[in-house]
Amino acid sequence: NYAGNVSTQECADNYARAFQVLYQAVKKSDRNARVFISLDHTWTAWTGDGHPGKEYLDRFAYYMHATEPQMEWHVDYHPYSNPLYRNDFWNDWSSTSGSEYTSYISMNNLWVLTNYLKKIENRYGIKNTDKDGNPDPTGGIRVILGEQGYIAANSSQEASQAAATAYEFYIASANTKVDAIMNRAYLDDPAEGIMTLGLRYNRS
């Protein structure tokens, strides 16, 4: 999704147009398939490159509503800890707060994302109820947590990695907007240095 040195608005608009082409191709093959946009854990923080997720999401949602309001779209979120190598995400209330304007969204404050998506649904009239007007747990903008993980470079870190992994699955299962959760890696990747995110060591 690298678009060069462009504004958030221009980047999100280009992304939305590409998404619309992808959506048509996917639906032609499988009309029941869901199509997702991908966002990382940076929510309002400015890191010097890329675009803050909240601003990007706002512009994407606006463009989609203005041009193709009938197209359904969903969010693949990557709720890594901040910093990336932190396992005890539940102790981070400085960069991952409960505010809509939090700097980052990790598993510690995942509800900030899903609550904000509900606001977008209401803003643009995205259907999230059944035919009788009752809340539809499978309707509206759905979420998959498509990439996250916790480090264990040695046996002393295994317990904290296991605790973080178990807790993330508990949080995801309790959130009615989340349909799936996938960890970053099964095996450590030596090329990633200290980011030993695999559930198993790579001894090769």
Question: Which ranges hold each PLM region?
Answer:
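Aromatic-rich peripheral "rim/lid" segments of glycoside hydrolase catalytic domains that contact
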Residues: A3-G4, G98, N154-S204
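Short loop/turn motifs enriched for small/polar and acidic residues
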Residues: N1, S38-D40, Y186
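Noncatalytic carbohydrate-binding groove/subsite architecture in carbohydrate-active enzymes
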Residues: Q9-E158
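Non-cysteine beta-strand/loop elements that form the S-adenosyl-L-methionine
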Residues: N1, V75-Y77, N183
